Amino acid sequence: MSILKLVKGVLYGEGEHHEKPKKTHIVIIGAGLTGLLLAQGLRKLNARLEAEGQSAPFTFSIHERDESSFYRGGGFSLTIHWALQQLYDILPEELSARIFECVGNPDAIKNGQMGSFTFLNLRTGEPALKTTIPPGWKGARMSRVRFLQLLMTDLDIHYSHRLSQITFPTDNTVRAHFENGDQETGNLLIGADGANSVVRRFVYGAENSKNTQLPIRMLNCRSEYPLEELEACLRVDPHLFHAGDPVQDGYFMFAFLDMPPAGSKNGKAGVQLTISWPYESGYLGQEAPSDPPTELPEQLAWLKHMAKHWANPVHDLIYGMPDDSIVRVIRVQEWMPNDANRRPTDGRITTVGDAAHLMTSFRGENANHGVVDVAKLLALLAPSGNKPTDLREVPVPVSTDDA
């Protein structure tokens, strides 16, 4: 059974007369970007239908495994570019109007400085590639924490709900069981639970849902610097830039996360530094492949070792990293769906975002694909006139694989 048939059956009873349409309850597993975005999209869809004189067809609940939204930090930054219009389409107007409050350097945006795509040679400090952003291009390099806070507006999130099992009590319901003993029954269950998705594991099995670890290691850092120490970075780009080492291999990314108040000359700016290297024998003279250290002093020492022959501005950034920097080890992984390994769920379960198609962060596409997943899923769920849209007439993305 497809999502379409299930929604028709729940909302309209297919073949039966109902004085009041039933509501479809959607159980959202995961309160990250895609889970919150789906919830906001359902809010907007309900409001639109009510404004048209129809009953709001959807209810939903959000279930997060952690005990708070930022229990594990919330991440650093993300870029929405080719999916920006879909983001506007999904969000209620009062939230879409505030998207650019979440950017790392809001004054640059206000001044029309959309930036460039710049890739530096780490040995010379000069651009190996610099492409100016064309006029009219829209995109937002956002603080992930601020963006998630925006998406949480007016949402009720059930925390400490770590999914343990999924069952099917009736022909048109699905039930989520949580480790704390709680349960939630709905008509659709959407797995928005990230890279190590429990929903994906249920649908594809433990072995077929394993991520592939790539031969790359990465450290993601958040540091604060006096603004005057970042003037060279601002000259490269007011938002972010990338860089690579053509001699020893290695990748670097810089992004502004938080800027001091406008006009401040003594304030500090929060920035993101991302560094990765190949996991191979002999790298930087190490006999064995180099895993990232787990303790901060050793992590900072390793980064300085990598940056020894790098040019400014990156050299001084690395050597000047404060001792209170936040450094996280990032697993560079991917997962591709294979429907040959998929168990049938009668249209009651699907996945979005990293749960559906985990990819590496180097192209910065994860968030954009997650936004488009949600937009397409909402299009599949939205009624057309007095009946749901026929999913057979809508292009189905990989992630809405149960459509």
UniProtKB/Swiss-Prot annotation:
Pathway the protein contributes to: Secondary metabolite biosynthesis
Cleavable signal peptide: none
Molecular-function annotations in GO: monooxygenase activity
Function: FAD-dependent monooxygenase; part of the gene cluster that mediates the biosynthesis of azaterrilone A and other azaphilones, a class of fungal metabolites characterized by a highly oxygenated pyrano-quinone bicyclic core and exhibiting a broad range of bioactivities. The first step of the pathway begins with the non-reducing polyketide synthase tazA that assembles one acetyl-CoA starter unit, five malonyl-CoA units, and catalyzes a series of Claisen condensations, methylation, PT-mediated cyclization, and finally releases the first hexaketide precursor through the R-domain.
Keywords: FAD, Flavoprotein, Monooxygenase, Oxidoreductase
PANTHER family: FAD-BINDING DOMAIN-CONTAINING PROTEIN-RELATED, MONOOXYGENASE, FAD-BINDING
Top-rank taxon, per record: Eukaryota
Protein species of origin: Aspergillus terreus (strain NIH 2624 / FGSC A1156)
Protein name: FAD-dependent monooxygenase tazP
Coiled-coil intervals: none
EC number: 1.-.-.-
Class of this enzyme: oxidoreductase
Record-listed FAD binding positions: G75, R144, D354, A367
InterPro entries named among the record's database cross-references: FAD/NAD-bd_sf (IPR036188)
Cofactor(s) of this protein: FAD
Induction per the UniProt record: Expression is positively regulated by the azaterrilone A cluster-specific transcription factor tazR.
Stated family: Belongs to the paxM FAD-dependent monooxygenase family.
